[in-house]
A protein has these predicted regions:
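Short, flexible segments with low predicted structural confidence
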Residues: 17, 55, 122-123, 149-151
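N-terminal regulatory/effector-sensing and dimerization cores
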Residues: 2-102, 137
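A short small-residue
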Residues: 60, 129-131
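A general marker of short, structured functional hotspots
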Residues: 5, 49, 114, 120-121, ...
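Aromatic/histidine-rich interaction motifs
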Residues: 91-126
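Short, Lys/Arg-enriched, Trp-marked, Pro/Gly-tolerant hinge/linker segments that flank
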Residues: 105-119, 132-175
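Exposed alpha-helical structural elements
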Residues: 82, 120-123, 127, 162-163
Length: 175
């Protein structure tokens, strides 16, 4: 059975720090609440409107509901093969040439990166959240692939940044 590419998580209770083991890469967006990602003795705080990348492996996270409302996030999962297929499709079909000159200590040394989402990315995730309310969408592989392609396009065509750098570094893992 194919694992879903797009998942919405809703947590109404604070469950403390959790260990999350990922077998695929993930790009997520905070819809409501606060998320903490732990890196050794450091803690990164994410809030509504932040986009984040999680690499394959273990992550220590904590999700906080806010103001009596549940914590909500949308996550897109992908493999290096998925990413390579989508980038090739964007290049062949639309002539999208992708380059990335960005490199900083943050994205070189961490298995996660976070940043505020830019407008088109924020709108994309809000729209995806609306799609996920529709039961039919949840089991539609074609719709998931189209949304995933749109997400990859929005990141790959954006100016150089940590999220783009991490995403494009995952193509190398497919070779």
């Amino acid at each position: 059975v194919q694992q879903p590419m797009i998942v919405k998580y809703v947590e109404s209770l604070h469950n403390g720090i959790q260990s999350q083991a990922l077998s695929r890469y993930a790009i997520g967006y905070i819809l409501r609440g606060t998320k903490y990602i732990y890196d050794g003795d450091k803690r990164q705080t994410l809030s509504r409107g932040d986009v984040f990348y999680l690499g394959i492996g273990h992550h220590y996270i904590e999700n906080f509901p806010e103001g009596g409302q549940p914590f909500e996030q949308v996550l897109f999962y992908y493999t290096p093969g998925d990413l390579q297929r989508i980038l090739m499709h964007l290049n062949i079909t639309y002539g999208l040439n992708i380059s990335n000159e960005h490199s900083c200590e943050n994205c070189r040394n961490r298995s996660h990166v976070t940043m505020p989402a830019w407008n088109s990315l924020r709108n994309f995730f809000i729209n995806t959240n609306n799609y996920l309310r529709d039961e039919d969408f949840r089991h539609d592989e074609t719709a998931e692939n189209i949304k995933m392609t749109e997400l990859i396009y929005l990141i790959a065509s954006h100016e150089d940044c940590c999220i783009k750098s991490k995403l494009l570094s995952n193509v190398d893992a497919a070779k």
